Amino acid sequence: MPPKRKRGATVLKAASSKAKSIKASGGDEDGDEDNAADDDTTHAGVGGPKKKKMKMKNDEQQNQQQPTTNDETTTKTERTCTPPPPPKTCPYLSFVNRPLLDFDFEKRCSVSFAKENCYCCLTCGHFFAGRGPKTPAYTHALERENHFVFMHLENGRAFCLPDNYEIFDASLEDVRKVLFPRFTSEEITRLEKEAIWSKALDGTEYLVGVVGLNRVENAKGVNSIVQSLARVEKLRAHFLSASLIRSDGNNNNNKNENDTLQSLCQRIWNKHNFRGHTSPDSFVRKLRKQIKLAHPEKLETDIDNLFNDPFATLRHFLTFVVPKKYVDELFRGELLMLNQKNKTQPFVFVPLKLPDAPLFRDVMEKNAIPQVALAELLKPFALKTAPEYLILAFVNRFSKNQFTKEVSKNPTIVTFPVKNLKIQASSAAGSNSNSNPFSYDLLANVDSAGKATVKHVDGNWYETNDLFVNEVLAQQVTLGETYVQIYKRVASP
């Protein structure tokens, strides 16, 4: 057998032969140690140093590609977390259902009953509060299909929920014109001179300024008095000018209070309405609340009787609703009582008493209906200061029996002129001088049934009975049992 070779001797022999070759090539021992270390590191023999340089170069390139600061890392993270921009046009505007939109009622959330920050769903017309997560509006948008477009009831801004981005689209302007009735000075002047017809969503035409009013909570007297006061030109101009569209763009569009006489008058004269009628619901609710706060002892039946009676409603309006400035400027005058030793008395309306109804029947066994001329009822009075608008009230048209508590109606018919009502001036009272009397033309007449017959700017007469509006002849105005009248002073012919 051949002898076994020792591994250590072989390694020493190889190292000595390698040292001899390095000396022959002019190297040194340090360089040889470095090369040997490279060999052990790379396990590749002679090509080690070249591959190490390539590896270092690759490491430098990788370090250059990586971000070097924390700010750059944060910016990159923010860019990836930023939500996408909202679309230029909302894809859900086709689901806006205008026939279901009704802004006449109290603006209160239908879920939480909150008044603040309320939105209207333009698909179903219901009111909801909030816009953020877990709010009634946000929940409604998630639960109902295609109910995504909402409009703020105070400023008219539209949003798409639950994505929560604002919608800027001109197609919603007609909705804002119903939510916020606005008028230019030219439109107000035009409304005072000519009749304007408009078309509702259902295709029916209605006359702007003579629209039906929905009767709410036994308030028939409210409807008739509102229709009558809407004929007073200066008062109407004051209400419409409050929502004037200014040329400088500084419009008061931030508040939308639909529980005032001003807002109700604006809706009556708005030519952009979706319907040919409107509702005084929120206005009547506010009146009831004010009365309950001022007179807690009053019962609901007492308030019902107040708003069912046109004359009682008129007194309440002139005292608490119509601005005092316009009451004094338009309706206040001074009356000379000729049958009380020429006593002078200021007035807002002239109270007139009808003759009592006869107690006995005529020869035909029928109750005779008495008649009296308005001129006869005005004989005991003379105007010392003539107001621009004269209100006449037949205060004993209804009377209450003190024993039975029953209300009876006086059926006396009053004959009156539609034009050129003459009322004597105080200078002619008790003297033989022939001074010119004051002349008045009729604007509105309210009968005992609560129907208001009003004169429009085109000279035609219209009978309004809650939601129903019919054109009538001037001769038909004097046929009913008149209760309250409004006249306008004109130049004597």
Stretch-by-stretch model annotation:
Residues P2-P493:
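UBL (ubiquitin/ubiquitin-like) substrate-recognition surfaces
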